[in-house]
Amino acid sequence: MPSKIFVKGARENNLKNIDVEIPRDALTVITGLSGSGKSSLAFDTIYAEGQRRYVESLSSYARMFLGQKEKPDVDYIEGLSPAISIDQKTTSQNPRSTVGTVTEVYDYLRLLWARVGTPHCPNCGKEIRQQSIDQIIDQLMALGEGTRVQIMAPVIRGKKGEHVKIFEDARRSGYVRVRADGNMYDLSEEISLEKNKKHNIEVVVDRLILRPDVVHRLTDSCETAAALSGGLILANILPDDRDILFSQNYACEDCGISIEELTPRMFSFNNPFGACPTCTGLGTQLKVDPELVIPNKSVSLLDGAICASGWNNVRGDGISRMYFEALSKKYHFSLRDPVEKLSKEVMDVILYGTKGEKLELQYDQPRGKGVLYQAFEGIIPNLERRYKETQSDGVREELESCMSECPCPACGGKRLRRESLAVTVGGLSISDYCEKSVVDALDFVDQLTLTEQQMRIGERILKEIKNRLGFLRSVGLEYLTLSRASATLSGGEAQRIRLATQIGSSLMGVLYILDEPSIGLHQRDNDKLLATLKRLRDLGNTLIVVEHDEDTMRAADYLIDIGPGAGAHGGQVVACGTPAEVMANPNSLTGQYLSGKKKIEVPKERRKGNGNFLTVRGAQENNLKNLDVSIPLGTFTCVTGVSGSGKSSLVNEIIYKKLGADLNRMKVHPGRCKAIEGEEFLDKVICIDQSPIGRTPRSNPATYTNLFNDIRDLFASTPDAKARGYAAGRFSFNVRGGRCEACSGDGQLKIEMHFLPDIYVPCEVCKGKRYNRETLEVHYKGKSIADVLEMTVEEALEFFRDLPKLEAKLRTLSEVGLGYIRLGQSSTTLSGGEAQRVKLATELSKRSTGRTIYILDEPTTGLHTDDVKKLLEVLQRLVDAGNTVLVIEHKLDVIKCADYLLDLGPEGGSGGGTLVTCGTPEEVAACEQSYTGQYLRKMLR
């Protein structure tokens, strides 16, 4: 086996025909500026080729389902192992996915609870014991003399198949009837079941009317049914068609409740035998939220206080006005009064209806006038009924804007049915155990006391649970609970969970490619992550990590610096070798920052703010412990703390959502807090995240920043366009008129290849230019609209230097370090860091009010230290204009440049949620209890 991976002639995206050697069984870090070509080399070339070769080895039938990977633009790659990509874009959005299910810990927990769990009665909580035939007979006879009963044996419960043999055996044994999926069949007829569906089948053993003289017959029938089904007896009570399940295995003597034998599926919320029947295992239900129906209580009903569809036009001539006028007359209130001044009785009637009491509705329509007497359903029952009845996705989506998720009333958000939640191990239900953090869950397993027999059964299961929980702790995720929904995890957390799962698999000879695993990780936990990566390497695997973290780069066996610039200025190998060799290379920008020759300077002075504060009182969302914090306005404030300490709960869930609801009229549900003071000093809140600026290839930096509107207006004002009668719309590639109709303005055509990947070829009519011939004949300074879209920001800045409006927007794009991107570049090809800087540039180009608060969550994700320097300059400019910038960040280069810090902790999860310290970076660095302060101290020397 070769000792290296050889990449020859890589040209994917902006890579300039580069050759790279990567040592096998080593930790290699690829670094470089944002947009320099790191991901193009690691993911789009090496990983894509590894995947393609694997998929190509499968049959054409299998390839049809997997989707064929396109061959990357590379001459050849030698020494390639099977490749596994662990990136940040694959976080599951499935509401059924949790930390426990993703890591497979939950599978072992289900097995443990099924094998050594102690069942209890879901009614009285008493421990359930096995039920005898005599007890079953006593309960059936208690139904009363004359009751008609069918005794059935449940032979198949929730299993796929046609089950032909079951019917044949029953027929051969002399039985006459069976019930399949609730339908009764005669065994003499042909019974056909769908092979791929799950079925329930019961054999009818006896049909009888309960009387004292049938006890012996009933006993024989129950014993026969139990023998057929392995201990289960189903009594079908007629004529109600009500089923009672009895079990020789487990039953409560006092309540007479039976439960089936404990199986792993009883503890799965993704299986109908375990899931709560009310919420089907989701743990939540969508309910109409009064706070979202009437978000602003200072507005009157007449002025549109109600935001719900169908009830938001009280001034109109519709039915809503009729109802509200009748309500105001009957309950003596004015439609002009602010909602907050209406009594609780009036609000209850408006929201929940008149409970059958009729109103006098007066109508005056073109077709006539008159009086109707009708009850008022109430806004909330009306919205809930319409939501259940509608078949329209559009209506459903509109109604969901007034709804919020709340815990299921039946299971209390625990996802499982009552019988499953009543089974305990060590005194805890499986749901209670999953509410524990990883570190507490490990302690519980270590201290668990089992009988000798239970220990023999559960020993191997407990070992697997401990191993998997240990892997989660080793990647710095000890604060997560196993019940945490996967959709709520950050990109870094999701990636580290997948990393922990891979360590658990103990594979050898695999090529792992990771994308910034240090994201969201405090400096304190970095050593744990590095130890995990080295452990994966020492198993005999090759690791390629795209990373900007200096500690990770120093710990690498081999370092590759891609650059020297970004976009068209990048795509070359600037330096490679050991970290020491890269540091010694004068051409490497990364090496200069690693060696300390270049660094981000600490500001000479810290801003004090404008004298006003935004204060959060009594924050209690997630793990926040009644927290009070104040943020000085007019400053650059950083919220720090270890992973899981409560930063996102405070900033994203409480501050952003509360300000968004009050200042921006957003329909959101803010996190729990007693009050937020100081809102009057702000006019709007803007969250600048790394989400894409558009999800279709038609979206680009020019359209997002509104540059394209100005460019189209400019082309429409040319003499040529005026002579032809072209307006600005003619120069849009999204509408008919100016665009090329052969490709609908896409510039390319998709050709489906079935067993091969779809091919995109340039449109033959417009040659990829998106516009028709007539539109392209209109020129400004010798360039067509298509030529302008192909320009980089730097080229456009020079081209439009005489036009102040265009020049200002282009200059801000250049100042945030995006001079290399093309104006018409598809937004889907931009990295998260690039998308975030496009948003920042858009905000910078707007006229500042000086009263805006900007919120950024880990803005340095995907950014090289040199990019971070540019980002900080932009953020400082926003603050210099009088605005407030609030940032969640772990990168010390950003933290040291802040005016004010809020350090949460001290630990993650239940050990966090308090304010450890606050103040300037120097004051936080002086705090011995602050983990952030300990690392910050070295940076401020």
Label the predicted regions.
Residues M1-R941:
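Conserved phosphate-binding elements of NTP-dependent enzyme cores
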